[in-house]
């Protein structure tokens, strides 16, 4: 059974000549998995899902599933304004066997909390696949209140929440009122969320030096909070720059600087500005040069326990 903890990466969608570049996506996914991330999400906000048609989304999910094998769970982002349309899409995507659906509140229409509750329940009725509740009010126009999340948590199909409200008070309310794994969706609040008892993150910034984000998570799990804070402070300037312009422009700029993909986005999303890239380049280099000790006995023991809990084996990967 998939464990919705640790560092998950909402993988960007590479493009070539205007089309989805599946080989580049697979190569990037393989590199991320080899850095010991705990999960991937395709067709999330960072993956420009709104600019992909359903055929492209299905092909991307299949390609990432193929390269991940059993090394890493792959969740699928699902969003839309119409409950019927979203439910029908989930029903079609069940055959592609994602590890979970990352499901946001209906965008633009701004339903009541009752409407949000019924929306999630109606979509969940179409699948046995676990659902991660995605709260991102800055994009949907509506917050999913902690009480609504607690009500949804009564249904076993809801297993986690990606919390992107930017409010630590809501993080605490969710942790106090539901059984769900809480995954931080605001990278600038990653350390604070983990310190409050959060279970991990779905982190766009973790495209860059994913090993350091995994190490940060492991440090907190091992109770080495001072070291975790020191590492997070070293990552924070990069995190801020990666969200200084609309996501995923800066993330793709950073990956392009490393030669990992073309810096191409689909309209209406645009590449990072030249001024932004001038600021990003030296900070990116500092993070790429950062060296930390990641193989202490305590961390290795914690890593082995995580692998045992999730995969039923103490073999590393």
Q: What annotation goes with each model-predicted range?
A:
Residues 20, 194-317:
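Structured C-terminal cap/extension of enzyme domains
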Residues 5, 38, 43-46, 76-79, ...:
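Short glycine-rich loop/turn motifs that provide flexible caps or phosphate-binding loops at active sites
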Residues 2, 10-13, 50, 106-107, ...:
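Flexible, active-site-adjacent loop/turn segments at secondary-structure boundaries
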Residues 9, 42, 47-50, 80-83, ...:
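Short, flexible micro-motifs
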Residues 2-141, 151, 294:
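Active-site beta->alpha loop and helix N-cap motifs at the rims of alpha/beta catalytic domains
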Residues 122-126, 137-243:
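Catalytic alpha/beta core domains of metabolic enzymes, predominantly
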Residues 25, 57, 61, 86, ...:
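A general structural signal for well-ordered alpha-helical segments in protein cores
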């Amino acid at each position: 059974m998939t464990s919705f903890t640790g560092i998950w990466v909402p993988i960007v969608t590479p493009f070539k000549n205007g089309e989805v570049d599946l080989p580049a996506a697979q190569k990037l996914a393989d590199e991320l998995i080899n850095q010991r991330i705990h999960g991937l999400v395709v067709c999330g906000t960072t993956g420009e899902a709104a600019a992909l048609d359903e055929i492209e989304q299905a092909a991307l999910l299949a390609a990432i599933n193929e390269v991940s094998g059993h090394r890493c769970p792959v969740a699928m982002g699902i969003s839309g304004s119409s409950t019927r349309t979203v439910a029908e899409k989930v029903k079609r995507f069940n055959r592609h066997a994602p590890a979970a659906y990352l499901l946001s509140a209906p965008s633009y229409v701004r339903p009541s909390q009752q409407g949000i509750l019924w929306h999630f329940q109606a979509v969940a009725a179409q699948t046995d696949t676990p659902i991660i509740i995605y709260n991102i009010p800055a994009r949907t126009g509506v917050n999913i209140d902690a009480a609504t999340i607690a009500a949804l948590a009564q249904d076993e199909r809801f297993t986690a929440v990606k919390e992107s409200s930017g409010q630590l008070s809501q993080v605490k309310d969710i942790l106090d009122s539901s059984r769900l794994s809480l995954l931080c969706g605001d990278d600038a609040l990653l350390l604070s969320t983990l310190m409050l008892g959060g279970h991990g993150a779905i982190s766009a910034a973790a495209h860059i030096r994913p090993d350091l984000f995994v190490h940060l998570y492991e440090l907190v799990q091992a109770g080495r909070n001072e070291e975790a804070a020191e590492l997070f402070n070293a990552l924070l300037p990069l995190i801020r720059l990666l969200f200084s312009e609309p996501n995923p422009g800066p993330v793709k700029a950073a990956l392009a600087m490393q030669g990992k993909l073309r810096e191409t986005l689909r309209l209406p999303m645009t590449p990072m500005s030249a001024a932004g890239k001038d600021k990003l380049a030296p900070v990116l280099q500092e993070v790429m040069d950062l060296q930390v000790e990641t193989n202490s006995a305590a961390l290795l023991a914690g890593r082995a326990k995580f692998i045992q809990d999730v995969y039923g084996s103490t073999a590393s990967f």
